[in-house]
Regions:
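Electropositive polyanion-binding surfaces
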Residues: 1-261
Length: 261
């Protein structure tokens, strides 16, 4: 549970922050999703394996962002290469019909007594997108590895993270509301046409006084993502297969996926 001034972990602190956490210069046993990508971020090969990992460096998002912006720092070549691949993966997602709900995060400045001093908006930067894209890639790959039926073998029962198509009535109401601000939204047609229209709307609203309102209502016009053993794909991400796998310390369903893998 995440509060303004503290975090209550799902697992005991000895597990979540020490034994199960990838701490610098400590060897940890892991499930790893390993990819071979070319310079265009095409997946040439992938595998899910048990590994032992020793982390050479633990970065904060701010430290990684500084390397991306300045080109200087520890493991600069690795960080910059990963960032270039992440940008390609991100562009491909949107080309395939993913929706760009990249909203500002509300943050609080807290004093030592837990009293909020100020509130501010935190914008996602390239370092955030870098982690996000490889997290999505791993989650998608695990879902595909389990969910795709292999000839001659029975389909395995698996829990997917699914996201249905938006309700037409909600979309129409949303389109009528934003029309008051002079915006237009396509609510009928192919999935690609609708998601392209949504992304164009969100892009046009950026920097405008009504940006936060439109982004909030756009999210509310969507269906809620949920877990299901019946896979229908993930509409918002535009993935035919998707699950939660990468955060077993803070999300119980991810522990369940690892037991299946």
């Amino acid at each position: 549970m995440l509060f303004r001034s503290r975090t209550i972990p799902m697992l005991p602190e000895r597990l979540s922050n020490k034994l199960c956490s990838l701490r610098q210069d400590e060897e940890k046993l892991c499930f790893s999703v390993i990819f071979e990508l070319n310079e265009k971020a095409d997946i040439l090969a992938s595998r899910i394996v048990r590994t032992a990992i020793r982390s050479n460096r633990r970065f904060t998002y701010e430290e990684a962002q500084d390397i991306i912006e300045t080109g200087k720092g520890d493991f600069r070549e690795e960080v910059l290469a990963l960032n270039e691949l992440a940008k390609l993966l991100r562009n491909k997602r949107f080309e395939d019909g993913a929706i760009d709900f990249d909203r500002y995060e509300v943050k609080f400045e807290i004093n030592e007594k837990g009293k909020p001093l100020s509130v501010y908006f935190k914008e996602s930067k390239e370092s955030n997108h870098l982690i996000e894209e490889f997290m999505l890639l791993a989650n998608r790959n695990v879902a595909e590895a389990i969910g795709k039926t292999i000839k001659g073998k029975s389909k395995k029962t698996f829990v997917y993270r699914i996201h249905e198509q938006p309700d037409p009535d909600k979309m129409q109401n949303f389109a009528e509301f934003i029309g008051r601000f002079g915006y237009k939204l396509k609510t009928t047609g192919s999935k690609g046409e609708i998601t392209k229209s949504i992304n164009a709307l969100l892009d046009k609203a950026k920097g405008k006084p009504e940006q936060n309102l439109i982004e909030t209502l756009a999210v509310r016009s969507m269906q809620k993502a949920k877990y299901s053993t019946h896979n229908i794909g993930h509409y918002g991400l535009s993935f035919p297969f998707y699950t939660h796998f990468t955060s077993p310390i803070r999300r119980y369903p991810d522990i369940d996926r690892k037991s299946v893998v």
